Amino acid sequence: KAIMHCRGVASWIDIEKTKSDKCYHRIITGTIDAELFSIDGKTGELCQDFGENGRIDLRSGLGDHNPAFYYSVSPPAIIGDLVIVGGGIADNVSTSVPGGVVRAYDIRTGELIWYWDPIPPGQEPIIDDLGNQLYQRGTTNVWSIISTDPELNLVYLPTGNTAADNYGGHRNGSDYYSSSVVALNASTGEVVWHFQTVHHDIWDYDVPSQPTFYDIKKDG
């Protein structure tokens, strides 16, 4: 049984369906035990065509860890037909905690479309003995609310800290994206730009708020 909690939901209308179709209106939500659900907004039933009978295990690819060290704490973000999720990490407990990977799934099928592993540019991903790529452990995480801009096709991530919060002697550049706003291409997950608010953050400042947008006039 999933453990639900009051962290918000995302709502999406499938324009390829009619109002009488199942899952015309989808409610997407994460749980504190790290599952992502797609729910029919009319009936409350799981959308069986999403993931594994309506759910996705967000612990997939994170490696062995204490279940209390990774969980969903914010509503998913939606842009186009993608649902994008980060996750909260117990990043002040140990350096050996799950990574802060951000993943984009097809909102209809639950297929993983892309992922962003917040490792420094040039660092090689981890490959296990079976040739499977694993997400880097202890990296910067995105626990707060993600913003999207359909016009620019960008996803804006407010990042937290690299584990462990208050000591950085071991990091060796792994905090490259910590305490930053990171803009990703919504179609590919590639970094477009990022701005780091605190370099080598050992104070657990994070970027705790959802990025917001406004237009300004330059030079009058």
Tell where the protein language model's regions lie, with residue ranges:
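Short Asp/Glu-rich motifs
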Residues: 95-96, 125
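Repeat-blade elements of multi-bladed beta-propeller folds
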Residues: 3-35, 68-94, 101, 137-170, ...
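Extracytoplasmic/lumenal domain signature
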Residues: 1, 36-67, 101-136, 168-207, ...
